[in-house]
A protein has these predicted regions:
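N-terminal acidic, glycine/proline-rich low-complexity segments
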Residues: 1-222
Length: 222
């Protein structure tokens, strides 16, 4: 979310990323918004500082799905390591349920190189394929941390993933995440069901490479 909103802010010259997020949430029905974080938690931590933001989040957001951490344990994950203080604050103060797509999920569900090289050929340029090619020379299968967080957020009832028991995620000083189960906890993390692995990767490729649907032009007013 941080990267995409920063780009949106640059092009639209809005008052700032925090303003963009607040305006987007204000326009939503109560408990209707799903927030997806695919990078460092910097912008969401700044949002928590804004006047009335926590109440707004609590009323508008049903879940924060974030590509962050490593579960049940593991080394510091890059998104958290990029801004440890911001990640710690979001996990500690965000007022709605949080679901984390950990490092282990992204590495277990690689986006196929064959899809990157073939399925986007309908367009001379495509932001997804171009980004993968720019990151490193093809072919390579790309980890999908952000895609996992997004897929859970937009299709939670499809049961692509299992969820951990409720608990609390704490960000340690070195960037590692510690999960402690508790009935009153508001945090969970995604767990991969091996039987769903192929269907998840297939869903990734189908959605990511789909051609945009043309909008029908409105009839001119008589």
């Amino acid at each position: 979310m941080g990267v995409s909103l920063a780009i949106l802010h640059y092009h639209l010259r809005t008052g700032g990323v925090t303003t963009v997020i607040r305006n987007a949430l204000t326009a939503q029905y109560d408990r209707n918004a799903a927030v997806v974080l695919s990078g460092p938690a910097t912008d969401l931590a700044k949002l928590l500082d804004a006047y009335g933001a926590k109440d707004l989040i609590a009323h508008k957001v049903k879940v924060l799905s974030m590509a962050a951490g490593a579960f049940p344990d593991g080394p510091p994950e890059p998104n958290i390591r990029a801004n440890i203080a911001a990640a710690r604050r979001v996990f500690a103060e965000w007022p709605t349920p949080i679901v984390a797509a950990g490092y282990e999920i992204g590495t277990a569900l690689p986006f196929p190189a064959a899809s990157i090289e073939q399925d986007f050929a309908w367009s001379a340029t495509h932001p997804i394929a171009d980004a993968y090619r720019a990151y490193r020379p093809m072919p390579y299968d790309a980890p999908t941390w952000a895609m996992a967080a997004l897929l859970y957020a937009v299709r939670p009832k499809e049961n692509y993933f299992r969820l951990s028991e409720p608990g609390t995620v704490t960000v340690l000083d070195d960037g590692r995440t510690q999960f402690r189960a508790s009935a009153e906890g508001m945090h969970r993390y995604l767990i991969l069901d091996p039987d769903r692995k192929e269907s998840i990767i297939r869903t990734y490729t189908e959605i990511a490479s789909a051609k945009p649907v043309e909008r029908k032009k409105k009839l001119a007013a008589k």
